[in-house]
Amino acid sequence: TLFPYTTLFRSDYLKFEKTLISLNGKVLNKGAVFTLIKSNVDTKLYKENIFISQNIFMNITKANEKERKIIEIDNKPARLRYAELLGISPSQIENATLKNPIGRKIGDSIYISSIAGIEGDTLNMYAQVFENTKVEILKAQSALDIQKQTINQINSDFKEIYGIFCINCILRFLQFEAEGNLQELSKGLKSIGEYGGFVSYGEQFNKQHLNQTLTMLVFGRKK
């Protein structure tokens, strides 16, 4: 990567029909807009997710990478194997996917691919998946505890913060809204500086496409 970058996949407020972007008055529903920022202050890119390993590993043995579908896990139908590994019945999967997404580890970082839905025994994914890769089923931690860690990290890196550009996954938004802690999390982020951004259907953190993640570009003066 020549320089750090983050992007988002625009949402349409859960209609799942089409998304629109605009540049200089031209509106598109299939396209991308890129913004290059040259800043005279310090910047740093962060990502936050609330999921950790629970040591449930599996191999994607058959996938449709173009359509983001997992067909087989460990040479078994994906839906059945996912349920088996979690210790639940296949009928309970839809209630488990939001808090048990699939993760792939690169270095010390976990990148999330969220389950979009079940089609027969196939798992439809929001982010890219690759055949013949080892992945794992994750579990959620306290969003408030994770946010405190994020805030502490940013405050340890910067002595002054001028602003934060945020991209927050729609699935995080829905989860936090359902748990009743959305306002408290918003106040926590506001405690470190002014911020603004978008709710997205997917996030990009440098070269990695991922879900259920908050990416933040912080502007300020580093310590």
Regions found by a protein language model. Give the residues of each.
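Short, exposed "boundary/linker" segments that immediately precede the start
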Residues: T1-Y5
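Hydrophobic alpha/beta core scaffold segments
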Residues: T6-K223
